[in-house]
A protein has these predicted regions:
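Aromatic- and glycine-rich beta-strand/loop motifs that create alpha-glucan
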Residues: 2-43
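Secretory targeting signals
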Residues: 13-15, 43-94, 118-192, 198-199, ...
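Short hydrophobic, aromatic-rich alpha-helical segments embedded in or entering the lipid bilayer
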Residues: 21-24, 209-230
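Hydrophobic alpha-helical segments typical of transmembrane helices
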Residues: 91, 102-103, 221
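A cytosolic-side transmembrane-helix exit/cap motif
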Residues: 155, 174-177, 204-214
Length: 264
């Protein structure tokens, strides 16, 4: 789906109409995901991971066990990677595709502001990714009820942190997408940044600055997604959530201003 921008002679500004257009962009993006292969591929990957972990516990372990947190930990330890893959698929190409395909000059019913395009695409990628996160946690919670027979409240804290981490990663994905010229390059760089680059920067900071607790780094804060499920670890859930949200807001704002300055 392609979108256009308001022409220079159009001075009217209707906030409600801009939100309506953003909603249309969001629906079109989600429809595009559903009709394409990305949604199917990621759904299959998510189902495969759940199946493999469950099979491994059944065949080589003690089944689902009797401890809800231990069981949750085994499934949630892959969550950061799942979010990373989802952001690479759904967020990293959202903005760059408009420039790469040269389709953003096409109008649907009337011109549309760039911020409506940005907001619609951001919400679409966020909703799809968070949707998968919720489904994944719902399955884990169900397995906890089937196996141990109860659900510890820590898993809901972990869920909240996973949603915050998704938001933070989406901001990074859009930031990279706003300056790239090719979708493939944007996807690779997004994956590399979230999987390796931030961790490399984290290591340098810890060594060079002698900082033992770099709580302000996005990927470091993501550790609390698991730590809240492990009584042997010290988790700072509120701080981690704040760090993730700040990363998401800051990177999203920067990516919007970069996107707004680019010409279609």
């Amino acid at each position: 789906m392609a979108y256009g921008t308001k022409g220079p002679g159009m001075t009217g500004y209707d906030v409600l109409d801009d939100f309506r257009q953003a909603f249309i962009v969001m629906k079109n993006e989600i429809t595009k995901y559903a009709r394409g292969k990305k949604l199917i591929i990621f759904a299959a990957l998510t189902a495969l991971i759940l199946a493999v972990v469950t099979a491994a516990l059944t065949i080589w372990g003690d089944g689902l066990g009797d401890n809800s947190n231990n069981l949750s930990y085994l499934y949630i330890m892959i969550m950061s990677l799942l979010v990373l893959v989802a952001i690479t698929l759904f967020a990293s190409t959202a903005l760059v595709s408009e420039f790469e395909e040269r389709t953003a000059l096409i109008l649907f019913t009337k011109p549309i502001r760039k911020w409506s395009i940005f907001l619609g695409k951001f919400l679409a990628s966020l909703i799809v990714t968070v949707g998968f996160v919720l489904i994944y946690y719902a399955v884990v919670i169900t397995l906890c009820l089937i196996g141990p027979g109860y659900v510890d409240g820590a898993i809901f804290v972990s869920l909240g942190l996973s949603v915050c981490y998704t938001f933070g990663c989406a901001g990074i994905g859009f930031l990279i997408s706003s300056v790239m010229k090719k979708s493939s390059t944007s996807s690779i760089l997004t994956f590399f940044t979230l999987a390796l680059l931030l961790n490399m920067v984290l290591s340098v900071i810890m060594i060079a600055a002698h900082i033992e607790d770099p709580w302000f780094v996005l990927t470091y804060a993501a550790n609390d997604i698991l730590y809240v499920l492990d009584p042997m670890q010290t988790a700072h859930a509120a701080r981690a959530a704040t760090v993730m949200i700040v990363w998401g807001i800051a990177s999203a704002l920067v990516s919007y201003f970069l996107f707004r300055k680019r010409d279609f």
